[in-house]
Amino acid sequence: MLGEVLRNADRIVVMRDGKVVVADAASAFDRDRLVTAMGGAEARQKIAAQIAAAKPSASPLRVRARPAAQKDGTDLVACAGEIIGLAGLAGHGQTDLLLAIFAAASRARTGIEVTAPVALVAGDRQSDGIFPQWSIAQNIGIRSLARLRNGLLISPQREAELAAFWQKKIGIRTPDMNNNIFSLSGGNQQKALFARALGSDAQIVLMDDPMRGVDIGTKLEVYDLVREEAARGRTFLWYTTETEELDNCDHIYVFKNGRIVANLRRDELTEEKIIQSSFGDAA
């Protein structure tokens, strides 16, 4: 996490495209300056401006979910066009709730209401996301088979058109979308999984810490795409172990021991509040 770098480093050197773009004492950086240097743009200012844009005052409910361990009646609530963050220490129920919501989309579950199709972007793409023997185009199209069929068979043309659209839209760097998915870098593999989710009919996208270990350039591109799709009405539930990613969210639910222990608006969000909620006596 960037916070660990800022706390522990004596000196910070930022490289981009093989060149040193800034080098200074760690004390001269805050998170804003570091993210800006890594992304090559006023990244956080852009985030703040885009999220501050007016949203509809009343949006339809997309998800209402209560963790199994929750005894006080607190629900996670997400409406159309919202980006909802799930925070807290890893392994405290965030992934469990996302998987329960994903399952509830096809089978009713007590304590969970889902009103639109759901897609999941897994954090462990190797074991939970990628079809290793398939091409990039096939990996993207698997969630959209109904639209890609021509009779009983998949139309290669429709599959190629879908893949080409998302290659351009999300910036998947490859000379040929028919190449095997493992020909891509890790960041581009993750982009392909986002393309799979966003190219489908899903109006609810569950993100299970999908940007862990991904380079900052890819992260910033995905952040832009998530905000763009949210502005069009898609709902995102975003679990992340990286506090700075929560700047993209409208509301943040903090988890501890399988329960929601805090609900913060984005303008209330600080790393200190998340830490206090994660370690405090609220649960």
Task: List the model feature ranges, each with a label.
Residues 1-283:
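Glycine-rich phosphate-binding loops of nucleotide-dependent enzymes
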